[in-house]
């Protein structure tokens, strides 16, 4: 066997590529999302700093400090995920509301920039109290925060976090503060740039600018728009150098995360800190080079900028390394300063070759270049000197050693020491130097700095004083402060130092052993009763949990606890890890804080500790007011009754859903194993393992019981809680998605107790905090346009977020409704629990959101303003509210004023509940017209607009007018243009008419009406009957003014036409534009001609016209009538014209629309302008559209011109739509098929069809030889080696091809349309005579505007606007182009799926111009053929499925004749094309149109995206009339080649055909036609056949083909987005609808025709049921593509 080094192993290559793809997907899935807008330089900085993390840029916000904030957010996530419930130091005000896990926050009184931060802090939630205290100097309102600072606060907390808030504290100060808090761990994020270790100066790096004046350091990052960060230098230096604090408060400081010079420090209290050296900047990209002369002195008495020049300069490390390598390796004669300068200049330029950066470059200042050249030259000179001296002294030493005698060598061997510590070379020290010598070096490399200093805490007073005095003495001597307690600064160590803390480990490797609690424990619910009470669970759940006992198997491995809970017949799994996300029933998030070393867990207000004891597992629970211990014995408990477990799960789910609906912040979502487990109430990673393998996700209690109404059953006992949920009957409700288990009977004794939530006789029954849903008896009375509703019934049946109580001034329990609230929610009257007050109203969230509103007492005084305020004070909330009629009870407020006050002061979606007396009043006074509610905000904005408007000359008449909040009733008559809305108004019905323009005013006045423009009408509309014409186009503030001032108001207008325009661009018009609901719609126009109606039908689907003018739009003619333009500039350029806005509402006999280029944006953004322009004329409209603006919005004459050019006529035809009905479920056999497992169904299908999982995703078959035509190839045939799919199963039942591959497109072009065509020259008369058995002589066909309308309608449904239809110019490529596409669907097969050797299928798309030219003719011919078809012959899909099935069922004694064409399109030639042209001529199509069709079909060019084929004769699927002519050719071949006896039914669709007959034979002339055209027919004659996706069974009918449908589902890609899964569900649902009445019959027939077992079909139907229920499971697979293509041979014909 020969092996070669260049042979590639495909398997290994594929595995490597898949691994690389998986790595890339994993990196993207865990990428950091960068939200701010960044410059190119900022992006490069972030990418370099965040390596190796993957970044995803989604710019959507502007930040002042984008680079720092991205780093800050990343480090903040790390700190908060590990800290759990903690104390936070110096929190940013905007982060307070987002982090509920913080138990206390330490602030300082705001000064400077902090004041600005507090002003922009949120004014809601916990941040509001902090903001108020900070800005007003008030003391803290509660214990959650303080302003004493971290050093002055003593709030106890075990863990803390400090995000960039410790820069002004030393490590010693932090250690003492942590001791006062009792804190053991503190996560601190700090910004520690290395430049603070250098002397004062200005340092500029690639990322930031740092100014160091000796005391303070200011850092400003690249691209910042505000001031930089200002910190104390000494503190930053101490944080960099210190790794431990010694003394009475010892600490260990670890660097657990680092991004650039941003660090997360973990400060841990440790009794004996050990040495922990670390390298702070191992990835530093700068080297700091010293300037020998320094920055220079001060040139005068006054300081200048030169004093800020740097002693050191930041130089890119790659520049310094390359410069030193170049200089050190130069020849002695070549080494000089000028050569170094030349080289430095060369490497300082950035060089890019394509996308490869060959040289990064360096943009340096003159000072930096001078310092670098000087330092490099002197350093290299010193190194060369050392090299020379080392060689010289070494040679002399070698000569002396080799000259030694025997005695000298013996002496050295006997007396000189050697051992383990001996290192070669250590015995020689030719050169020694001092730190301050010039030869000690000119640069500082941060990459090799190592620090391990200790800082004594301030309690060591005597030692600190001695050290201070010694340091001062050393400074007096002119020396550096080298304290003997600390190592020297900047110790240089190896560059690969392994710092475990720096790499990210926050676990001490020497931690104490963790106790193992693994085992099986018995957890009875009775042992956790105190915890349930602390959790505020309803009595029902507590009682049910007390009767259950669970077995919990605990497994503890590597700081992780896995629990398996066995509860009855259910198994739950949970995994406890630090930082795990706990499921909640609200927006608030909770993360589990789990410390295995301390055996503690905490989240929210709950915490627990556990330990293994002799009696079992001992757990201590701590919560609000609870300190409870429980011991769980080892062993296995008896299994609880399944019915009890099911009832417990259902009650628990109802409680969770009720709490989720009522809670604003949310609490834990309680799972069964979370309440019956040793670590209650936590249940992270909840998983339910069902014992039934055919059960899907819907069998979980979280889905199943949501569909069950929790109504107490009177037949079952009630122990003070809601009884078992009753299952609705099948006849009353739809069939559930999965079968539900019947509820088990309650084994407890029967007691007589009142239902939950109802008062017992002689006692007050108090409902729990969260009530359960009961049966509703409310009645809907009215719905407002904003979604608000009025009900008759009980307020407590509402599902709104808030309930409003009619309270008293003191908010104490009272009578009436207030007493009912106290009965249900007594805790809501606790004043200490009020979260907010607004006026007299009080808001509380305990035990649910309730607003106590106070109405005035009308027994003492009538106070309408107080009544308005009572409702208005309840609107300061989020969510909806349910109201009573405030004050209408004891306070004797009349119903009418209270109801009107609610109408004016409520929010959208609110509900009002009326008692019976008020409900009868409402029904007697029900609004008969739509109402417009003017809220305070709308009124305020409208008044502002009126005030601005009254300052102009036009609006002076509106001065002093006001809009007040209230409710206005109106009548709105809307209609299509020209429907006669204005003509319907008579003078007796109106006093004043308000119109938007002077033209309309004059037209109304000519009719005798008192008409005014909106501004002048302000003087006359008060108390009058007002009609407002073109109401939507009036300025909304004037519209509201007139509607409110009028006695009655009648609006006229068209919502689809031009609305009011905000000419001032102040934003007031869209803010107050009212939402008007038409009371009546008029759809008949008396103005618009027929062609205009068709153009605007998209906006007016029901428009009809009485006009006799059929065509009124003309292009390219001289201007006539009134000129209409779109802009004021066009109006100035065309005298006598008016703008479209001014012409709105007017009618002209003839118009001319002039579209100018400056109106492009107006027309594209507002189609209403085009509608108004088109609907102003009655007879003729000339369009002058030089820029083509109207063509861009679909208004063109090309379609109409081509239609009349082809011989179309104006007239009427029957529509081509076939009426279809939906059969009723009279025999619902589908209901007997339960959902089944998807996996088992597809595996059974694979077993019975013999298909196996394919190792490849697709096959590129060998490309055949090009036999005719000319093929144009792309330069590159790049293909994808693999395909990613989301599939239902890994076994595909279709021919596997790769439609998206370039080689597949070539194979299809050559294999299907490049094959040689067999020409057949013969007369068509014989074939036409045979075809007459199915299609008799047609005769002349009339093509009318009905076919044109159907063509346009089809284009609109596909999202086309007609702009692609051009004038018929055969020289234009856009007119004659034929586009080729590869079909993205493969054929279902029961045979081989891979080795089929078939090329793909293609589809062509003719130009829209040709489709519009031939389309109406082909539609008319198709209608003529359908009218002539004999009885029992079915064409295409132009029939109702039930009719076809009935015809098949009637042919009981027939067999099924099937014919399958092979290469149906490829075998069509000049003969089939000639037959088509003969039928066209027979129908009366113009000769030039027939010859054009023959020309296009006989010689064509298929244009693929990157390939093209010039060929002849072949037919392509996708051209206009494809179904028509394919079906006609199919009919002609079958009827000419075969004779049938007792023909009962014949159906033809494309290349599919069946004939139901008793027997058949081949006709005498068949061989000639088959041989002449090269036809390939595959005939089958059997009892049951297949046709167009259905199974044809004579005597039974046409049944859906379940096997084929399920098999085709396996081939498609159903991802990656959810919209594909929804398309699958809808398609399967439509298919199952066909099986409603024939499911069982389908099982028997389909199994017989495919030769499979009936169980397979039964299983497939169940699988489809599961998919239709939304339970489809998808598997992502990455499979290679098998490429079998060879070279393509081209030959020019």
Swiss-Prot record:
GO molecular function: ATP binding; cysteine-type peptidase activity; helicase activity; metal ion binding; mRNA methyltransferase activity; RNA binding; RNA-directed RNA polymerase activity
Activity regulation field: Putative protease: Inhibited by chymostatin.
Residue sites binding Zn(2+) per the record: 671, 673, 686
Residue numbers spanned by region Y-domain: 241-439
Ranges for region RNA-directed RNA polymerase: 1207-1693
Residues of the Macro domain: 775-921
PROSITE patterns reported for this sequence: ALPHAVIRUS_MT, MACRO, PSRV_HELICASE, RDRP_SSRNA_POS
Cofactor binding remark: For methyltransferase activity.
Family: Belongs to the hepevirus non-structural polyprotein family.
Function: Methyltransferase: Displays a capping enzyme activity. This function is necessary since all viral RNAs are synthesized in the cytoplasm, and host capping enzymes are restricted to the nucleus. The enzymatic reaction involves a covalent link between 7-methyl-GMP and the methyltransferase, whereas eukaryotic capping enzymes form a covalent complex only with GMP. Methyltransferase catalyzes transfer of a methyl group from S-adenosylmethionine to GTP and GDP to yield m(7)GTP or m(7)GDP. GDP is a better substrate than GTP. Y-domain: Indispensable for virus replication.
Full protein name: Non-structural polyprotein pORF1
